Amino acid sequence: MSISKSLVLNEIKKFSPSHIIIGYSGGVDSSVLLNISKELDIPLIAIYINHNLHRDSLKWQIHCQQTCQKYNLQFISHSLDKVPKGESFEAWASKQRMAFFQKIMQQYSKPLLLLGHHQDDQAETFLIQAIRGSGLAGLASIPHYKELHHGGVLRPLLKYSKIDIEGFAKLNNISYIYDDSNEDIKYRRNLIRNQIIPILQQVNPNISQTLSRSANICAESNNILQKLLTERLQSISQDTNLIISELIKLDDDIQKNLLHLWFKQNTQQSLKSKQIKELHLAVNNPSTGWQIDISNYYQIHIQYNQLIIKYPTTINDISKEDIISWLSKNLNEEIDLTKIVIRDRKPDDKCKYRGRNKPNKLKILFQELQIPTTERSKAKIILKDQQIIAVYPFFICG
């Protein structure tokens, strides 16, 4: 399928963005996206994320910068730190990239982030999620458009194949770089791209298109499911608690999905399959006082006819070592413990949430992040040089 420049431009324009942010790696996908998007009469900012892994990463950065200078586009580069021990590089780098994109987006009234994912990326992601044993939400893979806390992210090339994109680049004499680390099969995505997909193409030459279609079907089905479940959840909830007698009137599969949705809405965390099974068994044989530890911070209790989320300990039971460990994991930098102060929350405490220009009262941030009111009193304020740098166990400031 040939890329229609007019269709891509019209799709971007329908969001009426004040500014366009492009994740620009210099590869063929983002180079084509940049080449098309620069024709819009909308301020455009290209962002290059330097992962500092490849010997040519600085050359690529210079290439991207020079391309932006050629077209008189704003260019921003950002260098990632070393991945923390025990973290998956792919997952960590993805989070770091998105965090920086959103930090830049906060500066504008209605920003739209453009990413160059294509049909082959979608097929690879679908396989990755299938290998993990994911449900509908995971198999939906890469969303075409997603609302962010500030602005949105659009992938206008998602329906086009890599071959389509390379053909457009050749036809329009677009210069781009090639990252030979894409051949390194120690990374799971590269293994799937370079070894598994070619085998599947022997069975179905259009495998990427087929898997991409399956991902779209899963996304549509999941959207419908979530809307129906959300409506049902409201009818069997009392504040943040679940009414057990109403829940168990429903089919088992609906119960399990509602348990997962209920916990995620109230904690922003997901239950594991094993936890859902245990929880489902418990609500169908309810015993007041029953409880299960979900993570280091959450417990689920049965109290009479209600399912309740609680912290496993009171705030006074949480040691300074636990808080420092959490801070070290989330701050991704060395901490001078002599400069750290930990105290309880005060009514007028403010925090400049990551990516924002101005501080907000914690009450406002708690509301925006949908942190349950029952949990907010458990917050610990972490200060360095008299400045709030984090709110344990919820988020980092800065």
From Swiss-Prot:
Keyword ATP-binding: yes
Record GO biological process: tRNA modification
Binding site for ATP: 25-30
Gene3D superfamilies: HUPs (3.40.50.620)
Entry-linked Pfam families: ATP_bind_3 (PF01171), TilS (PF09179), TilS_C (PF11734)
EC number: 6.3.4.19
Superkingdom: Bacteria
InterPro entries attached to this UniProt entry: Lysidine-tRNA-synth_C (IPR012796), Rossmann-like_a/b/a_fold (IPR014729), TilS/TtcA_N (IPR011063), tRNA_Ile_lys_synt (IPR012094), tRNA_Ile_lys_synt_N (IPR012795), tRNA_Ile_lys_synt_subst-bd (IPR015262)
Gene Ontology cellular component terms for the protein in this record: cytoplasm
Coarse class of the protein's main subcellular location: cytoplasm
Subcellular location: Cytoplasm
GO molecular function terms attached to this record: ATP binding; tRNA(Ile)-lysidine synthase activity
Catalysed reactions listed for this entry: cytidine(34) in tRNA(Ile2) + L-lysine + ATP = lysidine(34) in tRNA(Ile2) + AMP + diphosphate + H(+)
Broad class of enzyme this protein falls into: ligase
Keywords, in A-Z order: ATP-binding, Cytoplasm, Ligase, Nucleotide-binding, tRNA processing
Record keyword Cell division present: no
Classification via HAMAP family: tRNA_Ile_lys_synt
Domain notes: The N-terminal region contains the highly conserved SGGXDS motif, predicted to be a P-loop motif involved in ATP binding.
Family: Belongs to the tRNA(Ile)-lysidine synthase family.
Role summary: Ligates lysine onto the cytidine present at position 34 of the AUA codon-specific tRNA(Ile) that contains the anticodon CAU, in an ATP-dependent manner. Cytidine is converted to lysidine, thus changing the amino acid specificity of the tRNA from methionine to isoleucine.
This protein's name: tRNA(Ile)-lysidine synthase
The encoding gene: tilS
